[in-house]
């Protein structure tokens, strides 16, 4: 778990994901250090790795990247920014993460609303954020009119479902 625990990616997706599935969470260092991440993957035979695209880019760019045995990796989640196809190809081929998924959401949606699947084609994993999670509804509206936007029109994403928080603690104005 090289992603920060103060963010929903580390705290909810990583910790809660491991806890709910009986998996082990590995914390390679206090802050993100690419060498520490790959050392931990190799030493602990990790099967999954989380990160934002720039974290994977930093790991792949290590001068000694080729010395790490990453054969135990198979999956993970990449989120926080779009992933260039070149990076996703390298993550698939050089890091053995052929089942890495892309996720999109907000802290307020606990934290993911959209996600690709492990079998999503490469081009879908780099050009979309996947499909809406079950039991979650989304729409894109014009913030000035509250009307639903046409396909291709920019607007505000609205999410509804069991995963959406009820409000900000003792802050009704922000809610």
Label each region the model flagged.
Residues 139-158:
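Conserved beta-loop-beta connector loops within the AMP-binding
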Residues 174-175:
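Short secondary-structure edge/capping micro-motifs at helix/strand boundaries
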């Amino acid at each position: 778990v090289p992603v920060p625990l103060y963010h929903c990616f580390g705290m909810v997706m990583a910790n809660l994901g491991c806890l709910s599935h009986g998996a082990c969470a590995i914390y390679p260092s206090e802050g993100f250090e690419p060498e520490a991440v790959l050392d931990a993957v190799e030493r602990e035979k990790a099967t999954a790795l989380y990160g934002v695209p720039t974290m994977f880019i930093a790991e792949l760019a290590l001068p000694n990247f080729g010395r790490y045995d990453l054969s135990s990796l198979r999956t993970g989640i990449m989120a926080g920014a779009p992933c260039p196809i070149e990076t996703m190809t390298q993550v698939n081929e050089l890091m053995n993460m052929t089942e890495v998924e892309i996720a999109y959401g907000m802290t307020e949606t606990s934290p993911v609303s959209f996600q690709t699947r492990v079998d999503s084609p490469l081009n879908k994993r780099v050009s979309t954020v996947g499909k809406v999670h079950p039991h979650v509804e989304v729409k894109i509206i014009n913030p000035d009119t509250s009307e639903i936007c046409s396909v291709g029109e920019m607007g505000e994403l609205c999410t509804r479902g069991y995963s959406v928080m009820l409000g900000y603690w003792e802050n009704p104005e922000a809610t």
